[in-house]
């Protein structure tokens, strides 16, 4: 059962190129998925990401128009396993659930997906139920990304950054043949703002085409001896490809880099909180202009 109705809000998902989208973070994520040409989405309810499932359910007409398959999964493991469609086919797919309760349930599917790698972009959108407002034990999804070598995106909590992270996540996944985890903290899920929309895109390769042209690549099956080859592939090919993409696209950001010789490194999701602290200390103003250099890590690649 839906926690909330987004019947009126989903009309904004039809906004075209150059139009201004105004709304909630969860709705912006859905719009970004449409603009990215996603082929399928699966997920399981869980705060703070529950409303994303509600939006997708209420947007069924729009999803159908764009040939997008939406599945309300029986569990987080089922949702994560759905991403296997992107292993052999150039299909962009997304799975969503809460962290870390959901990542615990989905960990086996995620580990196998990360081992074999992907052909199409695979994006795991996790609602990070951590810190103020949390309802669970205080653990984070970062540990799961580290153990399975999944690239973790942690955007600054504003709509343009979140939308850009969704799109970059698919591109990074395709460039490095690795699933990408998009971390949305509690406030990022429900932040309100605006961004300039782009046109929605249909997937150039459809699920129907995948079913009519089945492919089988035994080298992607996570069993010996290929599972050992996957480990070499992770370090020798996927990791360098990810670093090249992240560096080339400038996913991590510098602010006020010429202001001083000493600065701060901050995770993207903590950017707003840091600026508020600096403003209280007189080192930044209320408009977010810092007099201290800041290196904002929106992408955190795992270390083997």
Predicted regions and their residues:
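Flexible, low-complexity linker and terminal segments
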Residues: 2-26, 156-304
């Amino acid at each position: 059962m839906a926690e909330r109705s987004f019947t009126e809000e989903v009309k904004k998902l039809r906004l075209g190129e150059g139009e201004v989208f105004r709304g909630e973070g969860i709705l912006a994520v859905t719009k970004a998925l449409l603009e990215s040409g996603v082929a399928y989405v699966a997920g399981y309810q869980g705060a703070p990401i529950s409303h994303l499932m509600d939006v997708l359910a209420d947007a069924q007409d729009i999803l159908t128009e764009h040939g997008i398959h939406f599945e309300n999964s029986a569990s987080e493991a089922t949702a994560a396993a759905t991403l296997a469609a992107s292993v052999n086919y150039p299909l962009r797919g997304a799975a969503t659930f809460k962290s870390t309760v959901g990542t615990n349930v989905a960990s086996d599917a995620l580990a196998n997906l990360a081992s074999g790698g992907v052909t199409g972009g695979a994006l795991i959108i996790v609602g990070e139920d951590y810190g103020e407002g949390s309802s669970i034990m205080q653990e984070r999804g970062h540990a799961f990304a580290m153990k399975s070598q999944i690239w973790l995106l942690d955007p600054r909590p504003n709509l343009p950054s979140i939308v850009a992270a969704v799109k970059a996540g698919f591109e990074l996944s395709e460039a490095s043949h690795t699933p990408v985890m998009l971390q949305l903290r509690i406030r990022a899920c429900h932040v309100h703002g605006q961004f300039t929309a782009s046109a929605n895109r249909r997937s150039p390769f459809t699920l129907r085409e995948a079913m009519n042209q089945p492919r089988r690549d035994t080298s992607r099956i996570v069993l010996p001896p290929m599972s050992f080859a996957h480990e070499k592939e992770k370090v020798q090919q996927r990791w360098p490809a990810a670093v090249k993409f992240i560096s080339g696209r400038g996913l991590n950001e510098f602010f006020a880099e010429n202001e001083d010789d000493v600065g701060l490194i901050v995770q993207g999701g903590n950017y707003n909180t840091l600026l508020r602290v600096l403003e209280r200390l007189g080192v930044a103003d209320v408009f977010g202009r810092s007099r201290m250099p800041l290196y904002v890590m929106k992408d955190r690649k795992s270390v083997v």
